[in-house]
Amino acid sequence: MRTWTDVIGSEKEQDYFKATLATVRSEREAGKVIYPPATEVFNAFKLTELDQVKVVILGQDPYHGPNQAHGLCFSVLPGVRTPPSLVNIYKEMQRDLPDFVTPNHGFLESWAQQGVLLLNTVLTVQAGMAHSHAHLGWETFTDRVIEQINASCQGVVFLLWGAHAQKKGRFIDRSRHHVLSAPHPSPLSAHRGFIGCGHFSETNRLLSQQGMSPINWHSVCG
């Protein structure tokens, strides 16, 4: 089976992706502050190898404040205040999962280590400017990533929150995989159906039904 190194390596041969990476590099060299740091842009793939993927959570673009983004969607580094969307994710987990205690941090690496690919659809952003890298080619790259998961894996649970993530649903074969959709957890839309969606318990029910080990969502509580 291919690895993420294979997938990313073959995309780096494509003209569109060469242009994406060159633009990001030249912005950094020109002194613009770009998040996450260059060494962490592909963090999601380092922590969750292709043959380990059981769940995919799709975000949009990285957090654009200092010390927040580290390459995993919705996650922030330890010691950084939990952002509002993640506060709502925790709120739904507390409602959905017995004994879930809201953590005092937003560091989600322990989910990634269990097979939850925490993927933004755009992997870089300029400081203080949301969506500033939305049209650099990252979307094409993450389309390829989803196509690869669709083709290589079986029984993956995709959590698609908000219209942006749901658009990516067109690449997913629903006879091989599971798709759970809800409004985005941001404060603007969480109360339109994200709170109450039950996606975390439902993900584990679907994994268990296929003989796969469930995700210990509580791993962030410890």
Curated annotation (Swiss-Prot):
> Could you tell me the superkingdom of the organism this chain comes from?
Bacteria
Keywords attached to this Swiss-Prot or TrEMBL record, sorted alphabetically, are: Cytoplasm, DNA damage, DNA repair, Hydrolase
Catalytic center at which residues?
D61 (proton acceptor)
Note the InterPro entries from the entry: UDG_fam1, Ura-DNA_Glyclase_AS, Uracil-DNA_glycosylase-like, Uracil-DNA_glycosylase-like_sf
E.C. numbers? 3.2.2.27
- Gene3D superfamilies in alphabetical order: Uracil-DNA glycosylase-like domain
A GO cellular component entry from the record: cytoplasm
For whether the record's keyword set contains Hydrolase, the answer is yes
**What is this enzyme's catalytic activity, as reactions?**
Hydrolyzes single-stranded DNA or mismatched double-stranded DNA and polynucleotides, releasing free uracil
According to its UniProt entry, the function of this protein is described as: Excises uracil residues from the DNA which can arise as a result of misincorporation of dUMP residues by DNA polymerase or due to deamination of cytosine.
- What PANTHER family would the database entry show? URACIL-DNA GLYCOSYLASE (PTHR11264:SF0)
| UniProt protein name | Uracil-DNA glycosylase
Specify the species: Aeromonas salmonicida (strain A449)
Q: What is the lineage of its organism?
A: Bacteria, Pseudomonadati, Pseudomonadota, Gammaproteobacteria, Aeromonadales
